[in-house]
Amino acid sequence: MKNRIIIFIIGLFCLQPVASHADVAGLVPCKNSKEFQRRLDSSVKKLESRLSKYEPNTPPYLALETQINKTKNRFTQYGNAGLLCGTDGLPHLIADGRWSHAGEFMVPGLFFLYIAGWIGWVGRNYVQFASQTDKPTEKEIIIDVPVALSFISTGYIWPFAAFKEFTSGNLIAKEDEITVSPR
């Protein structure tokens, strides 16, 4: 079992994609893109035209000013984040495995997998709990909230708990425990 884990980890490092030095499909940094700047100017211009319809210091006027500042800040952050824009002026996410673009796709992707694993682990534990009660079907339909919250509060350590169960052999069901529907 440990040999498989070691081989898997070594395989992960060996199979990392080699960074290519070619451009990324004609994309340019957003801060250098004329179309990106045109989109910023267009968005701000639309908001300023709406702003001219209101008296200064009125709630709608102040709300639009805030919206203009948020729009400018968003475009500035996109430009400073090193995102690449296409000919349409929109930022494009690069998902090719390069570490220089890890913040665009890999980091949010790993965060998504962590949250999805948390939800799955908590659900798995709750279903296992429900199967050991007097009325398991009822416990699955009508969720026992205090019990579910206790599972949720401990679910954040799911990667370690899953690894522990995997190494102890409790994570994967045995062949004779898996039911097969007759056909």
Swiss-Prot record:
SUPFAM superfamilies: Subunit III of photosystem I reaction centre, PsaF. One of its GO terms (biological process) is photosynthesis. Keywords: Chloroplast, Membrane, Photosynthesis, Photosystem I, Plastid, Signal, Thylakoid, Transmembrane, Transmembrane helix. Residues 1-20 form the signal peptide. InterPro entries: PSI_PsaF, PSI_PsaF_sf. Pfam families: PSI_PsaF. It comes from the Eukaryota. One of its GO terms (cellular component) is chloroplast thylakoid membrane. It is found in: Plastid, Chloroplast thylakoid membrane. Belongs to the PsaF family. Probably participates in efficiency of electron transfer from plastocyanin to P700 (or cytochrome c553 in algae and cyanobacteria). This plastocyanin-docking protein contributes to the specific association of plastocyanin to PSI. This is Photosystem I reaction center subunit III. It comes from Guillardia theta. The gene is psaF.
